[in-house]
Amino acid sequence: MGCAYSKTCIGQICATKENSIRQTHQQAPSRGGTRATAAAAAVEEDNPVFNFSSDAVDDVDNDEIHQLGLSRDQEWGITRLSRVSSQFLPPDGSRVVKVPSCNYELRCSFLSQRGYYPDALDKANQDSFAIHTPFGSNSDDHFFGVFDGHGEFGAQCSQFVKRRLCENLLRHGRFRVDPAEACNSAFLTTNSQLHADLVDDSMSGTTAITVMVRGRTIYVANAGDSRAVLAEKRDGDLVAVDLSIDQTPFRPDELERVKLCGARVLTLDQIEGLKNPDVQCWGTEEDDDGDPPRLWVPNGMYPGTAFTRSIGDSIAETIGVVANPEIAVVELTPDNPFFVVASDGVFEFISSQTVVDMVAKHKDPRDACAAIVAESYRLWLQYETRTDDITIIVVHIDGLKDDAPRQLSSTGTQLQPPIPQVVELTGSESPSTFGWNSKNQRVRHDLSRARIRAIENSLENGHAWVPPSPAHRKTWEEEAHIERVLRDHFLFRKLTDSQCQVLLDCMQRLEANPGDIVVKQGGEGDCFYVVGSGEFEVLATQDGKNGEVPRILQRYTAEKQSSFGELALMHNKPLQASVRAVDHGTLWALKREDFRGILMSEFSNLASLKLLRSVDLLSRLTILQLSHVAESLSEACFSDGQTIVTKDQKLQGLYVIQKGRVKISFCTEVLESQNVSSLTTGITNEYDNLEIGTEVSIEKHEGSYFGEWALLGELKDSLSVVAVGEVVCVVLTKENFESAVGPLTNISDDGPKTRHSSFELSKESAKVTDTTALAKATLADLEWTTCLSTTDCSEIGLVHLKDKENLLSLKRFSKQKVKKLGKEAQVLKERNLMKNVIKPSAIVPEILCTCVDQTFAAILLNTTLACPISSLLHSPLDESSVRFITGSLVSAIEDIHKNEILFRGSSPELLMLDQSGYLQIVDFRFAKKLSGERTFTICGNADYLAPEIVQGKGHGYAADWWALGVLIYYMLEGEMPFGSWRESELDTFQKIAKGQLTFPRVLSSEAEDLITKLLEVDENLRFGSQGGPESIKKHPWFNGLKWEAISNREFQVPQEIISRIHHHLENDNVLPLETSKSLDTTEDQDAQNWLEEW
C-alpha cells in the first residue's frame, strides 16, 4: 500500500493528494504553447549574459547572448533558457558576472565527468547541470543547478528536469516577491510534467540541488542527496556550512516519514537474509561498506532507492519519495568567499569540509573543480570497482561589502504551509543548527565488497594490470623534467612514490613535426601529454558574428612546464580544442588505460598485500584489514653494508624485503619464542643441536620478512641486521598496525598448518559408518580445527573427535548472536527441516547429532567439507565441471521439492563442496515448507531472485529453477546475467523483470538454450515448471551425465573441480575463528527456552 499523501507529505504537515494535484495542474503550463509564447516574448537588449548547460543540443555559441525583456504573461526569458552557450571558458578557466545592486562579482567554473562503469563503458553521463547568469530579466538573479539522474532513463530525466525546472521557476507568479515559494512550486510542477511526459519515469528520475542568487541572498532548494556547501571564515579558519542535508534513510525524520508512507527500509544484506530485517543495522561505525538503507515497496524487490526525495520515480513516490524540496535562505556576508554545488559522486568519499579546503587552495575555480573531480575519481577507484558520475560547480564571491543592501528583513520572509521546509539564516548560522536535526552522513572510508572481490581475484589469479615496457629509456634529465611537471599537478598529487615511478615508466615518447595535429577539436582523446621540447599552440574554432573564427587560445612549451589532456585520462568527452606543433618537438604521453590501471590495480598496494599475506602472523586478516595495514606501511632504503638494527637496539616493527637481501645475526635463545617463524624457517638442520647462547647468522632475500614479533609487543635484543647490497624494505610498526586494525592477539599454531594437514587427512577419510557412537556426542568431545564459511550468526568448520582422526563438519550457531538478531525461530526452522523433513542423500549429508553448550548450538554432519563453490569461482569453470555441479543440484532440488520444500538457496556462497569434489547442501536458512500455496516472503541472495519475487507477486517452486539458471550462467560466464544489485540495483531490477539476457562469452548452443529456458520470465513457461525436473534432466546439455552414478557418489568428479579445491586448500587463508573467549558466556534463560527443542 502507498501513502495517499505521499506527494506532499513533508514532516508533520500534509495536504490531501487531491489538493496537491489540483494545485499542480493549475500551475502547469500548456505543453504546446510554451515555445511559441516564449519566442513571441523575446526582446533583445544589450546586456551580455552567460548561460551554460550540460547539453549542447541546439546550443548557440556566441559571446553576446542577449537577455530578454519582461512580458506581462510571465513568459520572459524562457526561450533563452533553451539557447545555452557551448563556448569555451576563457583562458583563466572561469566566468565573471556582476551583481550590480550589491556591487560584487560571481566567478564560476564547472566540470562534469561521466562515470567509469567496467560493464558499460559507453554508459551516458546521467548528471546534468545548468548555469544561467543572469537568470531572467533581473541582472541581480543568477541560477546554478546540478541534477543527478538514476535508473534506465536517468539521463533523459535529468535533462528534462534541468530545462523544465528553470522554465517553471521563471513562470511562477510569485517569483519576484517570494522566490522560496516559487522554488517549491517549480519542483512540484516539474515533477508532474515528468510524470506526464513520454520519458518513462516509473523506475527512473533525478535528484536536484539548485542555488539561486538574488542580490546578497541565496535560495537553496534540494530534493535528493546532492549537496550545496558555503564556505565561511570563522576565527581564522575556513569552515564548511552545509546548505542542504542529504535526504536519505540515514536521517531519522526522513526514515520515519517514508515508513509512514508504506516503505520498507532495508539494506541489501537484510534483503538477502544476511542480517536481521527487523533490526536497524545502519548508521554505526561498523557499517561502512557501501550497503546503505534503501526503500522497497511492501511486497516487492523494487525500487531500491537510497534517497527519500527526487523528481520522477513515480513508483517510489507511492512510498514517500517525494519531489518537495527543502529550501534554505541564506544572506551572504564578506566572510563567505565561495560556495559549491555538486552531485553525490563528489561527497561519497569526500566531506564538505574537505571540499571547502580543496577549493581554498586554488585561485581559479576551474582548477578547484578539476582537483575535486580528480580526487573523487581516485577515491572511487580505491574503494569501488567503478566510479559514479561526478559534477561540480564552484562559485567565488568577490568584492561583497558589509554595506551592500540587504534584502531580508530582520524577521525573514514568513512562509505558510504547505511550504514548511524553509530555513532562513543570516550570518553564520548553518541549517544544522537552525532547526535541522540531521547532519550529512560521514564519508565512506572502507572498500566495497565488489572492490574486495576484485583485489582477491588479483591476488589469486595474477590478473592485475601490468605496465607496458617502455619503448624509450628516459635519461635522468627527462625523468626530472616530467617529475617537475607532475609534482604539483592535482591529478597525480596523491600517488605513492612507487606509483609515480610506474607512471614514469608508462609515459611514451612522441616526436612532432611542425604543423602536426596532436589532438583534434571534436575528437576523442585518451592521452595526457607533457611537453618535453618545442612549442605547441592550442587552437579552437568558435562561432563569431561573421561565422566560424579560428583562435589561438594558448601556447605550451617545455620551459613553462606545460602539460595538457588531463581530463582525457578520466573520460572520452569530445575535445574542446586542437593542439598543433609550431616547430619540431617532443611529447611524453600517458594513456588513459595505463593511468586507470595504476589507480585501479593499486600497483604498489597490490604488491604490498601479497607481501603481507605471506606473513604467517597476518595470515588470518581479511582483505579489508590487509588493505588498511598496507596503507600504514612506510618505505626504508639501505645501502650495502649499512646496519639496519644493532644488537643493543630492539626491532620496532615488521620488515618485509622488497629488494635485495639482508644478513641477520642472533643468539639461539631468541628461537625459544613462538613468534619468530621468520627466523626458524632460515635455520638448517646443522643448527638444531646448538647450545643456547650460540650465535647464528642467516640471510633473508627479496619477499622474505623479519621482526613480526614486534607487532605483538615482544622486544628482542641480541639481534643485528645488515644490508647486503642495495636493500629496500617496507616497515610496519606496532603503533601503525594497531591504528589500522587494532591489537594483534597471539595466534597459535593451529592455523594454516592445520588447514593443510586436514586436507591430507581428507584423502583417506570417508563418511563415518558407525554413527551410533556419535549420536550422543557433545561439543566438549569435538575439537574445532578449521573455519570454512561464516554467516551473521553461524559458522561451518571441520572438527574431529579428540581421540579420532576422522574429520567431520560442524555447523554451529552463536547463541548470543542468534538472540541479538532475533533469529531463534529461523534457526529452529532450519534445524527441524534438516533433521526431521529432508532425507539424507549423497548431496544432503546425514545429521549425526545436535548438541549445545554454553556458547553454541550445533549440528554435526557426516561429511568432510572443503569450501563454498564461490571459493572456486575466481574465473569461470569449464562446461563439464558446471554440468556436474548442476546435475547434482538438480537431483537435490528434485528431492527437496518432493518433500514440499521451497529451497531458495542456489547461490555459490551457500552451496558447499566436500573434499572429494561432491556438492553438499548444508544451508537451509531460506527454505520453506509449502502446502500448495504461494509464498510472499522475500528472502534469498538478491542476485538470484526470480521476477515474480522482485515484483512481489508471490512465488513457488519455479523460483528455484530460475535461481538454477542464474547459477549456471554465473559459473560459466563469471558474471551475473542481469548485473549486480550492489552496483546498479535499479537497472538489475528492470533487467530481471524483463528477462534481458546476453551471453558475453561463447558457450555451447546447448548451454545457452538451457539457461534461456530456465531464465524465462513467465514462471508457467519456465523450464522445470512444465514437465518437472525430468524435463531438465532430459535436456541435451546433460547428455552423457549418469544421474544414478551421481546419486550413488560413483560419478568421476571433473579434474578441474579437484584441482581448484586442492589450490584453495593449499593457498587460501582460513577465516577468522569465533571463539568462546570473544562471546558473552553468561547463561540466558530465554536462550534456554528456545533451545529446549534442539
Swiss-Prot record:
Its EC number is 3.1.3.16. It comes from the Eukaryota. GO terms for cellular component: cAMP-dependent protein kinase complex; mitochondrion. ATP binds at residues 791-799, 811. Residues 107-397 form the PPM-type phosphatase domain. The keyword Secreted does not apply. SMART domains: cNMP (SM00100), PP2Cc (SM00332), S_TKc (SM00220). It is an enzyme of class 3 (hydrolase). InterPro entries: cNMP-bd_dom, cNMP-bd_dom_sf, Kinase-like_dom_sf, PP2C_BS, PPM-type-like_dom_sf, PPM-type_phosphatase-like_dom, Prot_kinase_dom, RmlC-like_jellyroll. Its cofactor is Mg(2+); Mn(2+). Binds 2 magnesium or manganese ions per subunit. Gene3D superfamilies: Jelly Rolls, Phosphorylase Kinase, domain 1, PPM-type phosphatase domain, Transferase(Phosphotransferase) domain 1. One of its GO terms (molecular function) is metal ion binding. The keyword DNA damage does not apply. CDD domains: CAP_ED, PP2Cc. A nucleoside 3',5'-cyclic phosphate 1 binds at residues 491-616. Mn(2+) 2 binds at residues 148, 344, 388. A nucleoside 3',5'-cyclic phosphate 2 binds at residues 617-758. SUPFAM superfamilies: cAMP-binding domain-like, PP2C-like, Protein kinase-like (PK-like). It catalyses: O-phospho-L-seryl-[protein] + H2O = L-seryl-[protein] + phosphate; O-phospho-L-threonyl-[protein] + H2O = L-threonyl-[protein] + phosphate. Keywords: ATP-binding, Hydrolase, Kinase, Magnesium, Manganese, Metal-binding, Nucleotide-binding, Protein phosphatase, Repeat, Serine/threonine-protein kinase, Transferase. The protein kinase domain is predicted to be catalytically inactive. In the N-terminal section; belongs to the PP2C family. In the C-terminal section; belongs to the protein kinase superfamily. AGC Ser/Thr protein kinase family. This is Protein phosphatase 2C and cyclic nucleotide-binding/kinase domain-containing protein.
